[in-house]
């Protein structure tokens, strides 16, 4: 009898340990319609006022009814979002980790948190570093999705780290789509005008060097004041997977 009890206890303990081991994988299999990394430029060209407008724009967009309607129209009726900030080489930080957005409450909580948290960096502009860091976030997402997208916003060209096209191509090889949100500058930087206003325009630079993958596109915000509305349009297109024709730049 005692031997039988010991065996029963051991079996129960083994099953309990197995359940604990399975729990993370079960959570990892929870399905969403999209894994979306919002990668925000906080380099030196983004001053305090521009930074404030960017954060407010993202917060407003994630909780916008039109964005929530697009989420609700998906098969799983939710997406997972991660928000990170990047600037120079080695300067990347997850500001808000993977969060499921499945309605107004979750979206508002995400938005409120985004408005509260401090700025991560203010350095040079390594778009390549931002992309590499964003790519590394997908394998640890506690959700599963058929689509993985990096949404890169920025107001200048890559001037730090390795060639941005190398980072882009590595992301595309993993099946990740990169979209761009270009923030145009009213006037070029006095000390480096081609950083914010390169030949062919910053939108052209992003189209040729940054974006790629299924349905990739560039959205343009004419300035930081119009950033909020631009990110709303961009997120709706990404969530609904309704991109513009290839090569078209949206405003």
Where are the model-predicted features located?
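Acidic, polar low-complexity linker/tail segments
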Residues: 2, 18-37, 43-50, 144, ...
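Second-shell loop/turn segments in exported
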Residues: 39-49, 81, 97, 113-124, ...
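Short beta-strand-loop
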Residues: 74-113, 193-199, 203-207
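VWA/integrin I-like adhesion module and closely mimicked acidic/polar interface patches used
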Residues: 157-205
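Von Willebrand factor
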Residues: 30-95, 105-153, 182-191, 198, ...
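C-terminal "exit" segments of structured domains
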Residues: 218-251
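DG-centered beta-turn motif at the end of beta-strands
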Residues: 41-42, 134, 146-160, 167, ...
